[in-house]
């Protein structure tokens, strides 16, 4: 369960850097299309830097407050590191570097210029593939980003899609990321993070679900976690999903949020648009089984 591992142990660390990484990124003046690889629930992008002849492998991760470069990759490529920083995470302290200035591109698209360098070796091990970095919420801000899970394409749209009210919900942009409101099992509205770095469908913070109704699943990261699993009914805007696989948490993953919406759910709509400019999360009109 890659998303839980990241959120509980790694991205709490990234959160403290978000305020320093909100420099505006200019929106594309015209639509731009980039290839993605949707593999085992995660979205991969090839990134080029002057220091490497081979492309680097980054995860597209709207749930990360800031973009990250793998410290191991940065050292291997001789990229100049910023000052050491001690980053407090849940139950541990990480050592990283900030800022790490990097001229990075995805094809012809210029990517954020400053990164937090952290050791992502645990994530790489869980993915069975080197994770050289993460494109976080700073990549999405002030942009209209369309993710096509079926065609494995990312498009930066010049303008917000027209006539989206029926298949969209309000998207709130916060310092630490993006969130939307959902109803779980017919309950009251709760805020959850929109997290393209989460491979699973839904992670829910609750103390109400009886333990006897749950199974368990291990999440391996900086530490091993046993995550209770259940099925819930989830309503988001005009959409109601009856049986959503859900990981249960007693403590908040992020302050002010009751969980995460991951690729396991978002991909069911085929196409999802994160319109940070207009503050809308737009779903494809056709559900994909």
Residues of each region from the PLM?
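Bacterial N-terminal signal peptides
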Residues: 9-20
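Pepsin/retropepsin-fold aspartyl endopeptidases
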Residues: 24-289
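Intrinsic disorder/low-complexity signal
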Residues: 3, 22-24
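Bacterial N-terminal signal peptides that target proteins for export
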Residues: 1-11
């Amino acid at each position: 369960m890659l998303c839980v591992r990241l959120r509980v142990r790694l991205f709490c660390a990234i959160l403290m850097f978000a305020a320093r990484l909100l420099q505006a990124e200019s929106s594309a003046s015209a639509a731009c299309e980039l290839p993605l690889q949707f593999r085992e629930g995660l979205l991969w992008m090839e990134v080029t830097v002057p220091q490497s002849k081979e492309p680097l492998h980054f995860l597209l991760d709207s749930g990360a407050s800031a973009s990250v470069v793998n410290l191991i990759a940065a050292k291997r490529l001789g990229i100049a590191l910023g000052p050491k920083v001690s980053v407090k995470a849940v139950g541990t302290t990480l050592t990283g570097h900030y800022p790490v200035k990097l001229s990075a591109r995805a094809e012809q698209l210029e990517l954020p210029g400053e990164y937090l360098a952290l050791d992502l070796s645990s994530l790489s091990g869980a993915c069975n593939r080197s994770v050289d970095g993460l494109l976080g919420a700073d990549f999405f801000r002030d942009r209209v980003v369309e993710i096509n899970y079926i065609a494995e394409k990312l498009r930066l749209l010049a303008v917000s899609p027209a006539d989206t009210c029926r298949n969209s919900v309000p998207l709130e942009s916060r310092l630490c990321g993006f969130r939307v409101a959902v109803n779980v099992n017919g309950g009251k509205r709760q805020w959850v993070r929109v997290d393209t770095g989460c491979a699973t469908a839904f992670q829910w913070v609750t103390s109400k679900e009886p333990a006897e109704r749950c199974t368990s699943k291990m999440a391996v990261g900086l530490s091993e976690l046993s995550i209770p699993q259940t099925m819930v009914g989830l309503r988001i805007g005009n959409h109601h999903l009856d049986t959503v696989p859900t990981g249960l948490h007693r403590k908040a993953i992020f302050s002010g949020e009751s969980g995460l919406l991951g690729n396991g759910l978002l991909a069911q709509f085929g196409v999802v648009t994160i319109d940070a400019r207009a503050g809308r999360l737009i779903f494809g009109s056709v559900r994909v089984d």
